[in-house]
Amino acid sequence: MKQTKHRILCALCAVMLLVSTAFPAAAFAEQPGETAAPAAETLSSADVREMQQTDAAVTALTGSDAYAAMDPDQRQQAAVAELFVLMQEGLVSAGSIHLDGENKLVSFSYPCGVLGGIWLEDPMDEDLDAENAVDPSVELQLPPDLGAEMQYSRSSIHHENQMDGPFGKATIYYAFDNTINSSRYPYYSYMKGFWSAMGLETKINTAVTVADLKKMGDNDLSVLSTHGSYYTYTTGRFWKRTRTTPIILLTEESTFSKDLRYGFDLLGHRIIKVNGHYCITADFFRNAYKGGKLANTIVYSETCEFLGVDGSEDNAMADALLSGGANAVVGYVNNVYTVYSRSMLWDTVNHLILGQNIGAALEHAKATYGEDDLVWYHSQGGLRPHAAASYAVLYGSSQAALSVPAANRAAALQAAA
């Protein structure tokens, strides 16, 4: 820690003058004469040792009390200063540092060609907090509101499915946090128990790894409950270009052995490393599910910016999953409010269990909670809405459905009558 602070302090004065006066934000990646080393086909042990040195310096910075106390501008200065020091030591590729002020990220490339980054802000929980609400008790309560159909049908469906066993499998890939003192996790734990009792055998993976996300095809329904963002980086050895891609953030920490294990995906930029943790891109899914390995699966993502942002919608994630055989993919444009997203998931899956197809189930959720999260936000008395409304979009077949027992559909029809 002392060495890290010393390096920051020593480099900060010298570097930040250079940063603020000589180089515009995007120029770090486009200095003439500076090119990234060509990517190798595999990672060597030497490559991984170098990356681990870089990761150790980055995580020492981002995990420090001093960094936690900084505002975003101060974090940017500290991150750039640290990366310039690492560049001088040969642990970051010259010319690869890129500032993305809009997405609060500094990206860079390791000498071996793997992509990395430093967040300037912690992933945000888009909540309706007490200070923004007329009524602070607007959180979805346990048990959540079941709606008329589910309330009426619950006992008969539960009885039927207890006799016949589960009709399908679902996994919630939960990587919002480590679940300790979590304000989110209890809701997902409740959903797991409720859906399992209704016949959809549901598991929660609270230690999601890159390897786990290659097994989503084992489920009828896979739910991605993780943070997400945009990652901006530069590519090209002689003619550099800036690219931006949506990414899914995991809590899985980078290690020497895992870097070797994931080397092929790291070099292919299907996995990147941010703040010493693994993140995945759309190409990860496209590569993992070649040959239709995701067939007959519905994917529901709660990830922020999974489908891009207003004015720059990005269907790369959805296309990658559909190319792997997924029947349908649901995701959000823009950053989505936590409670709205969770409520939409709850209502949508409940109506899938009742036998509705994904198109009808999603429309029911929108009718219940609002077409977008600002409709929901204002209905709850919110006073400080975020800049852009987040809304769910369905890709693939709107007719995709779970293979539920006839009793589920019969109960739903009886309730609706």
Locate predicted features:
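Bacterial N-terminal signal peptides that target proteins for export
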Residues: 2-12
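Non-catalytic propeptide/linker segments at domain boundaries
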Residues: 63-194, 239
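Sec-dependent signal peptide cleavage junction
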Residues: 21-36
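Cysteine protease catalytic core and zymogen-processing segment of caspase-like enzymes
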Residues: 231-327
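Structural alpha-beta junctions
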Residues: 89, 192-204, 321-332
